[in-house]
Amino acid sequence: DIWVNTLGLLNAQDWNPGTISFETILHEIGHTLGLKHPFYNSDKPDTATLPTSLDSIINTLMSYTYKDLEGVEGNEFSFHPTTPMVLDIAAIQYMYGANTSFHSGNDTYRYSDTGTYHEALWDAGGIDAILYSGAAPTFVNLNPIHGSFIGQPVFVQSNGVNVGKPVPNMWIAKGTIIENAITGTGNDILIGNGIANLLDGNLGIDTVLI
């Protein structure tokens, strides 16, 4: 069970997706499912840990570390994860098995340049597509356990100020195959996964890697 104190400070918290409070709930749900913190704990020295390079919330909600790909750290994100991240999904599936009926049809995941996203996709099957609409350049990588930069940029923040570079904010979980990607009118980068992909950059000077 998860209990949340509704008195005092927590009574004024914003619990909407993208907030640190919503991320905290996901973190605590991770504990109820058996997930542990990935960092060293001197009280439990024999507990398995992740390498420092992977100990980041962009990889697992069970981390306490907010950092970009170059290691610049802060104390939160400008927009927090709204789903378990790729290592969380992999660990849960290792313990309980994958949900093979979740998004098993032909699904389209829609994004825009005005939206803000921070999520990992688990898709069990079908012929699926990433559909991005907008003029801002975007970067879409269809390979599992890889991140994309899509929609409004998400930053690590230190006391409310953006630091470092934007972080990948849309990830594809291990075992998920997304076949197609269609982007907007900006100068986009699309990277395929070798699964008979349709990669369409529409307008703009695009780069497509297959």
Predicted regions and their residues:
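Active-site rim elements
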Residues: 74-82, 115-117, 165-167
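Extracellular, beta-strand-rich repeat scaffolds characterized by small/acidic residue-biased motifs
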Residues: 125, 134-135, 144, 182-187, ...
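Acidic/polar low-complexity surface segments
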Residues: 100, 139-180, 210
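Surface beta-strand/loop "capping" patches
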Residues: 99-129
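Acidic glycine-/aspartate-rich tracts in secreted/extracellular proteins
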Residues: 7-10, 35-39, 67-69, 96-100, ...
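Short pre-active-site segment immediately N-terminal to the catalytic Zn-binding motif
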Residues: 6-25
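Hydrophobic "rung" positions of tandem beta-strand repeat architectures
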Residues: 109, 121, 130, 140, ...
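The catalytic-center signature of Zn2+-dependent metalloproteases
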Residues: 19-84
